[in-house]
Amino acid sequence: MSQPVPLFDTYKNFQFLTRHNLDGELPAVLEAFERFSNPTEAMDGYSVVKLFLKSYAANQATFNSYRTHVERLLLWSLLVCRKPILHLRRQDAEAFLEFCLNPPENWVGPVTKSRFVRIGGRRKADSDTFVINPDWRPFNYTVSKATRKLADETDSAMPGIQAYQMSQTTIAQVFTVCGSFYQFCIDEDYTDANPFRAVKQKSRYKQSVVSQVTSRSLTQLQWEFVIEAAEHMAEQEPEFHERTLFILTTLFSMYLRVSDLTGRDNWQPTMGSFKKAGDNWWFHVVGKGNKAAKVSVRDSYLPYLIRYRTTLGLTDLPYPGEQTPLLSSLDGRTGLSGRRIRELIQMVFDAACARMIEEGLQEDCDALRAASLHWLRHTSATLDAPFRDMKDLQADLRHESLSTTQDSYYDSLDDQRASSIKAIPIKGR
């Protein structure tokens, strides 16, 4: 395949797609995968991009913008660079940005009304099929009504792709969105590198205006709904969801990433990963970059640990050197995949959202729909920051730089800074 094709449908139809399988995709999209040189790489890249877009599915305008830019990146990686999207490096990111500034003719066309065309009768029916709109292009130019009318009257061709020019604002959006995509992939443990962060001459692609990063954390109220939903699920179906409650509280209480629960090639978490030193409990992990670390365990987490261990028929608390797997499948197999853990957390989010709707909290539900597992880490750190020393929080988050912790979780210091000057008069002091 050399001609780019649309891979993602409208915002409305995207809402019906599931996160972790391709059951809801249009047949036209599935057929398009088979025409790529490596269909498996195409589907893998598509699946990760879909998860990224799901995290922005609460807002249609944001979704449409992010879909445009990250879909271009996916198509470029497959058709031009011929690399999996998660294997791109700095040079590739720079090449893509230059590509966006000057796309080839077959990637540019006029704005089309639809990405997919319905085939069927005059009225919509379940039997209708959808095919890819052959006029769709990743990059679009607009032609004014006057220009179109003049072309019709003089029987001349309308301006073509030479009319396309990407604005500085748009290329800045490309840079930001693609960088956000790779940060999402890092957070979700799909990759360790963000090629757009490493781009040289960033000023060429970034606006000088500093944009505010959207927070990816739940409010205190939303978190209360989430944990109460998990507790209710555990009470109703303990054989299935005591483990779910344990996973949720473990991720939240210790700011963990999903890989801290699934393990790595050279390390697997066990109950023995909990170790007591004096009066304090610690959870020992091997994190990103194979770095060993320990995370402090709060007292309020221990009842959840005891509760889960009781369902497994274990002693209340772990003993030194215990090799019991931290997590197992319901049929007793050691460990859980990251995909399965995400599915369980999503079940909790869905249950919490349903309860929010019952109580008239539609906006909170809309926000929760955008949440992913990694939001638990951000949520916990955000809620804990006012009560913890910055360096202690940095250590438990395992941030290399203190400034990362400060910039992410101590924005309230700006409020203190602003309020400290509000009441100071210019005269008459």
Which functions belong to the PLM regions below?
Residues 179-183, 242-262, 283, 383:
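Short pre-functional
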Residues 165-168, 225-258:
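Basic, Lys/Arg- and aromatic-enriched nucleic-acid-binding interface segment
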Residues 287-307, 322-348:
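C-terminal catalytic core of Y-nucleophile DNA break-rejoin enzymes
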Residues 423-429:
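C-terminal secondary-structure termini that scaffold catalytic or DNA-interacting sites
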Residues 47-64, 71-213, 233-234:
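N-terminal core-binding DNA-recognition domain of tyrosine recombinases/integrases
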Residues 397-422:
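Catalytic-site neighborhood detector that most strongly recognizes the C-terminal catalytic loop/helix
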Residues 263-307, 313:
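Conserved tyrosine-mediated DNA breakage-rejoining catalytic core shared by Y-recombinases
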